[in-house]
Every structure is written in C-alpha cells, then in structure tokens.
Amino acid sequence: MNVSSDVDFISVGCNCLGDCLVWGQNKLAAYGAQNFIALFDPIQSKVLATLPGHKDRVNHICWVPNINEEYKNRYSSYENELLSCSSDNTIISWKQIKGGLNYQYKVVEVLKGHSDSVTNISVLDFPDGSLLMCSTSADNTVKLWRRESLTKENIDTDTLPKWECIQTIDFTPKCMECSSLAFIPGTTIPLLAVGGLEPKIHIYIQNLDSTTATLQFKKLMSLQGHQDWIRSLSFKTINEGEGEGEEEELILASSSQDFKIRLWKISKFTAEKQKQQQLDESGNGGANLLGSLSTQLSGVTSLSTKGYLFNCNSVKYIILLDAVLSGHDDWVYSIHWSPARRDQETGKKIQEQMLISASMDKTAIVWRPDRTTGIWIDESRVGDMGGNILGQYGAVFSPCSQYILSHGYNGAFHFWKQNTNQKSSFWEPQIVVSGHFGPVQDLMWSPDYSYFISCSTDRTLRLFSEWKRNNNNNNLENNKEQQIISWNEIARPQIHGYDLECFTFINKKTHVIVSGAEEKIMRAFVGSQNFVDTLLNISKVQPVNDGTQRPLAANQPSLGLSNKPYFTGGSDYNENIDNNNNNNNNNGNGEENTEDSIKMKMGGGDEGGGGEGMDTGYFEDEIPFNPEVLSEPPFEEHLLQSSLWPEIHKFYGHGNEIVAVACSADGMYLASTCRASSADQATVRIWNVSNWKECANLKGHTLTVVNLSFSHNSKYLLGVSRDRMWTLWERSASNSEEPFVKVISAPKSHGRIIWSGSWSHDDKFFATGARDKLVKVWNLDNIKDIKNACASTLPAFGSGVTCVEFAPKSSKFTGEHGDHLLAVGEDDGKITIWKSTTSTSNPKSLDWTCVHTISPLISHTLDVRRIRWRDTPTINGNSLTYQIVTCSVDHSVRIFNIKFD
C-alpha cells in the first residue's frame, strides 16, 4: 500500500507584533505565525506553505535580494533567500530548495549570539554580492553580521557562505527595536539607523579605517525630534538614474508612538546649499537652520530645526528634517516605502516617492509629495472607521505598488487593490486569507460535513467552508466553465469575552452548536437565516427545511456577551410580546405580562437563568445595521460585525470553567465537564437536548475530565481525565430515571494525563492517547475484564500523544473486524496514520502498522489538539483519498489529503 499526503488548506493569523509582514519581489508575502513562517500568495488568497524551524514566536522577517545572475536564472526569482528572527534568541537563514516550487524553503543556518529575544533585522546587499545584516534584541544590543559573496563552489553545490558577527553595539539600559541600512548617496559606504525605547534615532557609519572584510561602525549622531519611542525606520534612495546631473539623495522615514512620521533627507552639502541656508556650524555637528521658520512655529515643540553635518571620504554631507507627517491619531507602528520597479517598456528603474504607514488608529495611510508644491500629503487612507478591531500593526505595498496588504491587532489581514479606471483612483478591498491568532483548541465538521468550525483561545469560533465558483476563462476548451474550489472563512458564529475551550454540533439539528469557555456557563447558538442563504450562495449547500424559524442575524451589544437575535420589523418576537400583552396583561399566575417579563421568559440576559425559548438578552437598543446575504467570502469587518449566530440558550450548573462538551449521535443528549480538583467537581453533566435541562450528573473521576466522546450508536459515553484513567458509561433503558450508568473505570490505564479518546466506526474499539507517549486500543467486548480489555498498544511515540481519531468506515479496508485507520497527533506537531489488521495470535486483538507520517514541512509545529476525518472519501480508480482537518496550539488549522493507492 502506497500512502501519500499533501496540504489542501492552511489558515493561520499573523503574530500580534508590529511589522511582522513582508512582500517580496518574488510575489510571495511572508509573515510570522506563532513559531513558524507562513508563505502566501495574496493575489490567490492562499497560504502556500509554512516554514518550521524556530522554537518560539517569530518577530520579524526580511527577504534577501538575489544579485547573483546565475542564481537569478536558476531560481527565476529576484529573491530566493529569507531571514527571520524570533523570541528564541536566534536568527535563521532560509533558502529556496533547488528544483522545488518557489515556496519550498529549507533552513541553511541558525545564527546564535543574542541572549534575549531578537526583535528586528535589516539587510543590505553590496555590489560584489556580499551582505550586511543588522539585528536588534531585547538584550539591549545591536549586532552587525557579514556574509561573503557567493563563490563558484557555493553555486555548484547550491550552498551559501556562513554569516559572521563582526560587531556588537551595547545600548544598555535602552533597548533598540528597529533598524535600517543604506548606502551614503553616491558611495558604497553603509549607513545604519537604529531606534527603540527612546525618542532618539541613532546614526552609525562605517569606520573608514576598518577593512571591507571587517566592517566596523562608529556612532555619527543622534537625531532628535520625536517625542516618544521609535517604532519603525526605513531608508530610500531617490533620484537614482533620473536625469543627468541629478544627485542621489537618501531619505530616512521614522515612525513613533508620538503619532508622527518624520522624513530626514541625507545629501551632499554643497556650496549652493550653504549659501541658500546660511548654515551656522556649532557643536556636535549640528546647525541652527530655518531660523525664521522656527520663530513662526515657536509653539510647535515637535518640529526640529537642526541640521546635522558629517564628513565621508572628504565629502561633507548634511542630514535635514524634510517633513513631519501628521495624520494618525495613535501610535504609528510601521512605515514602508513603495518598492523600486522596472518599467516594462523602457526597462528603467522606477522609484516612486510613496510611503505607507500603519497605526493603532485602525488606518493605513498612503503618503505622496504633491507634484506642484512638493509638500507631503495623505493621498489615501484605508482601514476601519469603527467596529471591533484594535489597530493596524503593519502595512506593505505589493511589488508593483498596486496593492496594499496590512495586518492588525487580532491577527487579521486587510487587502486593497488600486482602481485607476475612475477619474480619481481609489483602493478597493479584496478577499484575503484569515485565521486564528491564538491556540486552536477544538474543531469539528458539521453533521453534513459541508463545513467545519474551529474554536480558539483568541475568543472566536470561526466557520470555514468551500467557495465554489466558475472560472469564466474564454481560453477554456469548448468554452466549458471550470469550477474553482477554495476554502475560506465565511462566518464567525461567536466572538466572546472569555477564552473559548470547546464546542460541539447538536446532531439531528441544522446549524446548532454549543460552546464552552473559561466561564461557568455554556451557550447554544443557531445559524441565522442570513448564514443559511450565504452558505447556499458560496458553498452551494442546499438549506434543510427542518421547521426551525431562524432570526435574520445577530448583534452583540457593547457591554454584553450574548449574541442578540435580530429580526425584521414584523418578527415573531415582537408578535409574541404583543399577543401576551393583549391577553389581559396576565400570565395566568396573577402576574402582569410586561414587556420586560416576556423578554426574561424568552431567555433572559447574562444575569438570570436560561429559559426554554429564544435567549434575546435584555439590553439597550443597538444602532441599526443591515445584515447582508453574501455571494463571496466576507471581509474582516463583516466577519466581526455581521456574521454572528444568535444565542438561543445558556446552560448553568458547572462550578468552574468549561473544559469539554460532546453531543450524542442521535442528538438527544449533551455531555459537559469543567475544571476540577476533586471528585465532586469532576462530574459529567448530562443535558436533555429537547428541553435543554440537566438530567444527570455522572461520577467516576477525581480530576478534570478533559475529553468526552459518544459512540456512534449513542449507547456509550467515554471520558478521559487528568487522573490518568478513563471511564465508560452506558445508556440506560428509555424508562429509566438515570439516562446513563457507569460501566467501568480503568485506574492507571496510562502513566500520565490522558488527552484524547475516540471510537472506531463499528464501535467495537476505542482508543486513548496520553502524555506518556502511548496509544492504547481497547476492546469493548472485553471491557469489564480490565486486565484483558486492552486489544493492543501502539509502539511508543517520540513525544506525548495529544489526540487520536478513528477514520470513518470505508469499503477499501475490510477484515474480520473491518480494518481500521487511526490518526495520531503529538505535542511536537507530528501526525501519523496507522492501519490495523486482526491479530493472528488473538482474534480479539489488533496489530497496528504506521502507514504514513505527514511531512514536517507541511505539518504543525506544536501540540495537535484535534484531528477530524471527513466522512466520505473520494474514490478514483484504485486510489482512495480522505480529507482530515486538524488544529494546533501553533494557531493554525490545516486540511490534509491522505491518498491510499
């Protein structure tokens, strides 16, 4: 049997850090996602690959320009190297795999030298092909690294020279967090700018006494003017090759927490400039410039009027404040110039003076000097004028400067395309990738397997579905339309105020879920009518007429945690109030039927007990909004505000935070657990779905029950716990007062906490996986004879087992018991597929063989929390392909295709 796998879909948000995103000339964008790098194509709106290597959060990424012509031809790319830095104190050099796809990279070198988190890196390429890199760190140092140019041996063997640390600059007690490198205009002498937790920008220049091979830098000056910490620095050379007699000038853009952007111009100090500005040289290389302007602006303390002079190779240069850009209302985290590009017709290098800044005021601004006056103006402003987002952390231009890509506080991306078809150009929002920005704890396919929902400690439930549309390409043969299918987030059923831990679908009901978080109550939600219609438009999922009357949409009040149902003007909710009020204003118990009392009967708010009807919550009226039925995946703003599911019930009873929840296959019972440190707390509560009431409280454990699993026939309930044992309960007769009775507990069935349990498709076996690196498979027929109940123990794994999941039934795998497939996830991100055969020595036992291990290049990097098989595999001739969806503490959700030949 030949088994292979590939990744079909990756969803992960960007790290919540400033400037953690880059877009290269090779058309690939790279961003930090937990402890790995994600490479994606913004135009296709798809994450192509992830690069594992770091042990902690990735803080900054930088593409390395490829100036070697042979390498350019070999890789057909301007960039085929990448540098990244992390909170694990290291810098990693990445290189594109020879002969691989343009998004397949490997680790070339791990640079160690810093003693604390590395916060920023910048790189400069010399004409001879050598490289200079600057790294800043929380250890209060800045390190300079050098790499020699490629040799013939490097090119022949497809290797790279080693990086060497050539200088360490100590800034104790200050910490530098950003840097930028450039050449002094008209020379190949490097200039370094660093900034950090102080209002100064420190400028360093190469010590001309040092050799080219042992570059050493000396401090030139400190630029003053900002009133708060420096957040981002970026150099740009202008006037390069633009007409005869034009002198090169260098502009340094700096952004700060003082809400301002400053542009510093570095150019040769000519006699003409001296005559025009009448510079009066005075100490520290400074000069009192623009005296008249200073007098006029005496009340503006943030405008520096000082010019800075320095000598380089007997040539005098001056640094002048060129402009102060004021347009943001909060910290400016990121500043980037538009990239240089080649004119397709003339081949000339075009470097537009265009700048983009990203701020915590939720906007990104495109700045450009006015063509007539030369004054810098905010040409365009993109972002969110309201809503729930908390600001932009970074923004970059595409290689052609026709697109803007930004990332925000909640890990979300925002993508705009410039539309120049109109008289005045404007930026249109585009569909872009999305994902969690915190550990993903749970996920599950919908009962019909048309979509899945993931649950994260970033306090959101996210719903992903296939976007099915036709490719209207006129070049297709016979003009037949080809269907394109991609996975996208189309709804966000819950945005909570607590970290979400678990959820489950209610089987036999359409679009109904129950979630649990770090609070003592659970909440039930129903898909809105807008969601049902949107799912039909985007995924072609036909609605099921189950008699459920759905609210049009949901809205979350400003100070509430409940998703309030939203109806049209003539809703049943309003009619219910009117009918009850008209019924003699009496409820039959001598109490007046006021509007308030009816609202409380329909569910109440967060303060009271849950009723049996629709839980509207009693809050002040919200600002009206217009829910939309969409025909394509929504933007982040819509997901945040208009894709919530209405809350229909709250479950009260648990004394601590909810940990696990599960629903029986027949949809009759719901089981839930909470954090526990004693037997009284470690109970499993059973709820009757028909009336949402608690009907049993099952005992059997002494510590937290971390996972619950019903058998496919709904007859058994399996619980696994921190107390290192599992417990099995059996469904009672329908006329019994107790719906479930305990069958057996297995003390010390594992040596460490048991994280997961799963039933085989025929319910004859169940598997348990634990931190003791073992997976055990138990035979239900022998379950009461605990000594002989273990049908098999898989070989010890390399790390703790965090989840196990049996595959659904397939005709391809048959045997006396029906051969089984089992997926196992570990706490290092590894996923393996195992196949069973009936043991020849014991018919009631199973022998297991590992048939496939998903490649680390596409797999997770941290704990795998859930693995879910899609119900129906795809059969093509003799091959069979399953889909599994997985989630991890590494913030990512992935879909893998597992192909059996």
UniProtKB/Swiss-Prot annotation:
Source organism of this protein record: Dictyostelium discoideum (Social amoeba)
A GO biological process held by the record: regulation of transcription by RNA polymerase II
Key words, A-Z: Cytoplasm, Nucleus, Repeat, tRNA processing, WD repeat
Subcellular location as annotated: Cytoplasm; Nucleus
Keyword tRNA processing: yes
The protein, known as: Elongator complex protein 2
Lineage summary: Eukaryota, Amoebozoa, Evosea, Eumycetozoa, Dictyostelia
One annotated Gene Ontology cellular component of this protein: cytoplasm
Subunit structure: Component of the elongator complex.
Biased composition (Low complexity): 574-591
Recorded domain comment: Folds into a two seven-bladed beta-propeller structure which is required for elongator complex assembly.
Pathway: tRNA modification; 5-methoxycarbonylmethyl-2-thiouridine-tRNA biosynthesis
Gene3D superfamilies: YVTN repeat-like/Quinoprotein amine dehydrogenase (2.130.10.10)
Tree of life domain: Eukaryota
Gene symbol of the encoding locus: elp2
Family classification: Belongs to the WD repeat ELP2 family.
Stretches forming WD repeats: 11-50, 53-104, 113-155, 173-214, 225-274, 327-377, 387-426, 435-474, 495-535, 653-697, 700-739, 749-788, 796-844, 859-897
Function summary: Component of the elongator complex which is required for multiple tRNA modifications, including mcm5U (5-methoxycarbonylmethyl uridine), mcm5s2U (5-methoxycarbonylmethyl-2-thiouridine), and ncm5U (5-carbamoylmethyl uridine). The elongator complex catalyzes formation of carboxymethyluridine in the wobble base at position 34 in tRNAs.
Disordered, as annotated region: 571-598
Coiled coil location: none
Record InterPro entries: Elp2 (IPR037289), WD40/YVTN_repeat-like_dom_sf (IPR015943), WD40_repeat_dom_sf (IPR036322), WD40_rpt (IPR001680)
